[in-house]
Amino acid sequence: MSASTTATTRHDWSLAEVKALFQLPFNDLLFQAQTVHRAHFDPNRVQVSTLLSIKTGACPEDCKYCPQSGHYNTGLEKQKLMEVQKVLEEAARAKAIGSTRFCMGAAWKHPSAKDMPYVLEMVKGVKAMGLETCMTLGKLDQDQTQALAQAGLDYYNHNLDTSPEFYGSIITTRTYSERLQTLAYVRDAGMKICSGGILGMGESLDDRAGLLIQLANLPEHPESVPINMLVKVAGTPLAEEEDVDPFDFIRMLAVARLLMPKSHVRLSAGREQMNEQMQALAFMAGANSIFYGEKLLTTANPQADKDMQLFARLGIKPEAREEHADEVHQAAIEQALVEQRSSELFYNAASA
């Protein structure tokens, strides 16, 4: 099974085709992914974004991976919606350290009418700084989507998380079709889409393939496809799940690159548990977007200077804003604070 390196994109992938890609010899898969990547991107440029949690904890959703859910006791401090001025100060700091995207994430099922005016002011203020804006606020209705677009929001993150078949085992408070509807509203409003999923929740290979099929078979591919590795947090139902095999994670990135050749594939939550060698393999597999800074919502993220040191060693440079208009920021799945252990490839956050 091989993937085309032409500019043609497909929206009719089958499960058998995608599983065949996953089952390729590792070197062959990476070669194909890197070849496709080079046909559409500079292989030595990686887009960087900063993420800020503007409202933390007490979410009414029951996502089993998430410490921000009000259904679980994870010890995460609940916080109200951040003041607009504070958000703008954080955005200015993000711009100063080199970010070109600023994403604001709120732990909501959906934004309320009373919060929307503040959210819209955040978008306008960040946009005025010359940063590209993105948000993840949960489910949106059509009016909210239009309001965000009119305020200048560039990108909206709404993950599918996993396959339709496995989804009900992870979340019961929001349906898969509701997620797809929000994505449709976002696209109709003229904004760009960031949507991906999580590995390590107990899903099968069919589920991993099924997630990518859902994304690749959308009428338009998401501009950004975040691939998250579960960060296991004590108190959540998935705290004792087995670690993801690092080669399986790299395979997921590579297949995402083959199915969605023009999308930015984001190395997302879980990067804290990856050593430099694994991150280098991720870039070889076609990942070309990361978070930059100290925190990823409620999960620790490698320090910014450490990221830049790795970039220098690999000959990678941050992607400048003007070099592309089709990147989206991903508000990676909310997880709890995890200490950095750079000497280990993975470690169980539940033991911290």
Curated annotation (Swiss-Prot):
Domain Radical SAM core: 44-262
Binding residues annotated for [4Fe-4S] cluster, in chain numbering: C59, C63, C66
Top-tier EC class: transferase
A GO biological process held by the record: biotin biosynthetic process
Binding sites annotated in the UniProt record for [2Fe-2S] cluster: C103, C134, C194, R266
Superkingdom of origin organism: Bacteria
Needed co-factor(s): [4Fe-4S] cluster; [2Fe-2S] cluster
Keyword Transferase annotated: yes
Pathway: Cofactor biosynthesis; biotin biosynthesis; biotin from 7,8-diaminononanoate: step 2/2
Entries under InterPro entries matching the protein: Aldolase_TIM (IPR013785), BATS_dom (IPR010722), Biotin_synth/BioAB (IPR002684), Biotin_synthase (IPR024177), Elp3/MiaA/NifB-like_rSAM (IPR006638), rSAM (IPR007197)
EC number: 2.8.1.6
One GO molecular-function entry: biotin synthase activity
UniProt entry keywords in alphabetical sequence: 2Fe-2S, 4Fe-4S, Biotin biosynthesis, Iron, Iron-sulfur, Metal-binding, S-adenosyl-L-methionine, Transferase
Keyword Transferase attributed: yes
Assigned protein family: Belongs to the radical SAM superfamily. Biotin synthase family.
Function field: Catalyzes the conversion of dethiobiotin (DTB) to biotin by the insertion of a sulfur atom into dethiobiotin via a radical-based mechanism.
Subunit structure: Homodimer.
NCBIfam families: bioB
HAMAP family given in the database record: BioB
Protein name: Biotin synthase
Species this protein is from: Pseudomonas putida (strain W619)
